[in-house]
Swiss-Prot record:
It is an enzyme of class 2 (transferase). It comes from Oryza sativa subsp. japonica (Rice). May catalyze both beta-1,3 and beta-1,4 glycosidic linkage on beta-D-glucan. Essential for (1,3;1,4)-beta-D-glucans synthesis in grasses and cereals (Poaceae). The mixed-linked glucans (which are not present in walls of dicotyledons or most other monocotyledonous plants) are particularly important constituents of the walls of the starchy endosperm and aleurone cells of cereal grains such as oats, wheat, rice and barley. They can account for up to 70% by weight of the wall. One of its GO terms (cellular component) is Golgi membrane. This is Probable mixed-linked glucan synthase 7. Its main location: Golgi. Expressed in mature pollen. Residues 251-279 form a coiled coil. The keyword Electron transport does not apply.
């Protein structure tokens, strides 16, 4: 590939490196960005827009008020501990048991408060970014970019989805001569390689068609089959209305019909590859195969290459640039008995192979099911990496990566299991953008290559310092070491370069080096993304968050309850692995380079599964005495306790409302996130704690289940919602569901038992204290059941519409049964 317009990334002049090195690098403020562009005739590429100052001030005030209430509450709890224990003992529980119960409850409440503070404080300084991609219309200003696409199992990640992702990348609105797409096939599956080859052939027609008519999105599956209300989320809107850019409407209709016919034929060929060999004819096996590096499309030149006017290409391509970005298939070597480090190992292999083939200064990371939905997404990401100065471009310096939010097709309209996760992306990540930047979350992320090499940002380097290509750190490959020292991209697709790339993806290359520790993606955890981003922030790098409109990238998400819980289990286990590693946010270095609130955010990200231990106890233990008829809740709550409880609930609601106001998420999305948090905490988080405890005790590695991917548009709305969302209604029992099912059953039975024993009739209580003592336990049961309602829907499958009457009937039957047992006991004891 051609040089990146003189864009230097590995070393900067001493004048650009501030001398001050006594603090972390916080995100640029609106004022600083304005000063950054002073003297430039053009507007800055990135602007920071302020979120409503009044809303943010109220949000911060409410958070600190709630923290103050926490402090007063715990002071009161500890001061009056003896009185609480004595009161409980008077209700029928022994002194030692009461003390144990009180201590456990205080520990749980302290943990919940601590986690809430860790979650809220990093979100108190949110900023919102806007980019001006039109300022980069001059293609000579754009640097080269490598795009990494990873797939690991053709059974769970359809090769057709990988092919569509590749096609969307090749058709993106970025100079063809400056993009190289690398596809990592970690299973060595012949069907995956065949699908990528088919995509390379079809790209010769698809990419010029997209350029000619300016269609969006440039994923053919979503474009042709993702109509309004379909699995593609209505993203094929350009065909019917909107931003049509072609010469004439009839010409678009004719060309579209021809291109669609070719796409359907390609799709049939890929399906035939899968049907022809159910065992996925592989180059060996998934964990034992040779390395392969194959250039499928050579790098394009810098000069436009116009198509022909005749029908040899099915459509008229006169005056259309038909050049294609380079496409490389990579299958790293894997041997039994050697650690391959899952996705992190595959990404590091791509990082080395791409260095000797293209060496672009920037790298975009996409999962195989995440396609480019907005053709300007690549340019938008580059806006954060470079600055316009005069008539050229300079490196933006300390931005290590740009994280785009994950958006999904094919999710049920109600988003029962919070797949969109808007609270995390549009609230937490947006809030972190005002500190050192968002957390890296695995896909839809644009990296600076030099940051992946473990290099400090410019402000923390010595004047004139660059990258020290140490063989003990990077390995012994001379071409790769030369690429590390290089300041510009290059294009090498000759035999020697391919042979060198093949050697760089061998399983033995990393032996005795710093790969996976100080270089590249971090090993030792199944959530290598969080650990890798943390290492960059710890060195002083910043990151940026950008939510494009339309969405930059879109993917698929598991809408089946079992698949979703296994996905959450993998994330939770990976977070705990980071906590027990050298990358522990509490103990790791970088004190001056890492913002304290950024450290708090990473600590929250790695310890949240421990919440399950306390939450499960709260869901079960208070309800069991009610079922047994004991007096664990007989002690009447004091007015002070009720006042604290009311204050905490009111401030929690106020924080939620203000949070939705400044982040733009809906209250319904916030509530669904709360519900699924409860479901996850009583199931997947518990399993993650058990798995990691076993790993810490025995050293046994954690095995995880790869999340199944699917084409969102494979079931069209014509087939009806039952078929379109068939996975949502499929009931697949897994052991992860057992604790949550137990918590749900215990709390429903507790409600029935309380009613059967007459504890619901608080209006008949002799005093207000007695009424509160009767009402609070049942209110807590209702709180648990309401949070677990999506889980109950998942257990009902296609009968989920009847879950309300079924739960009601279950409660009535349980009430009558308990009431009957109470009468029998009274009769026999009379």
């Amino acid at each position: 590939m051609p040089p990146s317009a003189g864009l230097a990334t590995e070393s900067l002049p001493a004048a650009t490196c501030p001398a001050k090195k006594d603090a972390y690098a916080a995100a640029a403020s609106p004022e600083s960005e304005t000063k950054l562009a002073a003297g430039d005739e053009r507007a800055p590429l990135v602007r920071t827009t302020r979120i409503s100052t009044t809303t943010i001030k109220l949000y911060r005030l409410t958070i600190f008020v709630r923290i103050a209430i926490f402090v007063l509450f715990f002071k009161w709890r500890i001061t009056y501990a003896a009185r609480a224990i004595s009161s409980t003992d008077a209700g029928g529980i022994g002194m030692s048991k009461a003390a144990t119960f009180w201590t456990a409850s205080i520990a749980g409440e302290l943990w919940f408060a601590f986690m809430w503070v860790l979650d809220q404080l990093p979100k108190t300084m949110p900023v919102r970014r806007a980019v001006d991609v039109t300022a980069l219309n001059d293609d000579t200003l754009l640097p080269a970019m490598d795009v990494f696409v990873t797939t690991a199992d053709p059974d769970k990640e359809p090769p057709l989805a990988t092919a569509n992702t590749v096609l969307s990348i090749l058709a993106a609105g970025y100079p063809a001569g400056k993009v190289t797409c690398y596809v990592s096939d970690d299973a060595g599956a012949e069907v995956t390689r065949g699908a990528v080859v088919e995509a390379a052939r079809f790209a010769a027609l698809w990419v010029p068609f997209c350029r000619k008519h300016g269609v969006e999105p440039r994923n053919p599956e979503a474009y042709f089959n993702g109509g309004e209300g379909g699995g593609g989320g209505g993203k094929a809107r350009v065909v019917a209305r909107g931003s049509y850019k072609g010469r004439a409407w009839p010409e678009l209709v004719r060309d579209r019909r021809r291109v669609r016919r070719e796409y359907e034929e390609m799709r049939l060929r890929i399906d035939a590859l899968q049907a022809a060999d159910a065992r996925r004819r592989r180059c060996g096996a998934a964990d034992d195969h040779a390395g392969v590096v194959q250039v499928l499309i050579d790098s394009a030149g810098s000069a436009p290459q116009l198509g022909v006017a005749d029908g040899s290409k099915l459509i008229d391509l006169a005056s259309v640039d038909v050049r294609l970005p380079a496409l490389v298939y990579v299958c790293r070597e894997k041997r039994r008995g050697r650690a391959h480090h899952r996705k992190a190992g595959a990404m590091n292999a791509l990082l080395r192979a791409s260095a000797v083939l293209s060496n672009a200064p920037f790298i975009l990371n996409l999962d195989c099911d995440h396609y480019v939905n907005n053709s300007q997404a690549l340019r938008a990401g580059i806006c954060f990496m470079i600055e316009r100065r005069g008539g050229g471009a300079e490196d933006a310096g300390d931005v290590a990566f740009v994280q785009f939010p994950q958006r999904f097709d094919g999710v049920d309209p109600g988003d029962r299991y919070a797949n969109h996760n808007r609270v995390f992306f549009d609230c937490t990540e947006l809030g972190l953008d005002g500190l050192q930047g968002p957390i890296y979350v695995g896909t839809g992320c644009l990296f600076r290559r030099v940051a992946l090499y473990g290099v400090d940002p410019p402000r923390w380097r010595s004047p004139g310092g660059g990258v020290a290509a140490d063989p003990a750190k990077f390995g012994e490959s001379a071409p790769f070491l030369a690429s590390v020292r290089a300041e510009q991209s290059h294009s090498r697709d000759d035999g020697d370069a391919i042979a060198e790339a093949s050697a760089l993806v061998s399983c033995a290359y990393e032996d005795g080096t710093a790969w996976g520790r100080d270089v590249g993606w971090v090993y030792g955890t199944v959530t290598e993304d969080v650990a890798t981003g943390f290492c960059m922030h710890r060195r002083g790098w910043r990151s940026a968050y950008y939510a494009a409109a339309p969405d930059a990238f879109r993917g698929t998400a598991p809408i089946n309850l079992a698949d979703r819980l296994h996905q959450v289990l993998r994330w939770a286990a990976g977070s705990l692995e980071i906590f027990f590693s050298r990358n522990n946010a509490l103990l790791a270095g970088g004190r001056r380079r890492l913002h304290p609130l950024q450290r708090a955010a990473y600590l929250n990200t790695t310890v949240y599964p421990f919440t399950s231990l306390f939450l499960m106890a709260y869901c079960l233990f208070p309800a069991i005495p009610l079922i047994a008829g004991g007096g664990g809740w007989n002690a009447a709550p004091t007015p002070t306790y009720v006042a604290f409880l009311a204050a905490l609930m009111v401030t929690l609601a106020a924080v939620a409302v203000l949070e939705t106001r400044w982040s733009g998420i809906a209250l319904g999305e916030w509530w669904r996130n709360e519900q699924f948090w409860m479901v996850s905490a009583t199931s997947a988080y518990l399993a993650a704690v058990a798995q990691v405890a076993l790993k810490v005790a025995t050293g046994k590695e954690i095995s995880f289940k790869l999340t199944s991917k699917h084409l969102a548009s494979s079931a069209t709305p014509v087939a009806g919602k039952d078929r379109q969302y068939a996975e949502l209604y499929a009931v697949r029992w897994t052991a992860l569901m057992a604790p949550t099912a137990a918590a749900l059953a215990v709390n429903v039975a507790s409600m029935a038992a309380a009613g059967g024993g007459g504890r619901w009739w608080w209006w008949d209580a002799p005093s207000a204290a007695a009424a509160a003592a009767a009402a609070l336990p049942v209110a807590f049961n209702v709180w648990v059941v309401v949070h677990l309602y999506p889980f109950a829907l998942g257990l009902m499958g296609r009968r989920s519409k009847a879950v309300r009457p079924i739960l009601f009937l279950f409660a009535v039957v349980a009430y009558l049964a308990v009431r009957f047992l109470c009468l029998l006991l009274q009769f026999h004891t009379a």
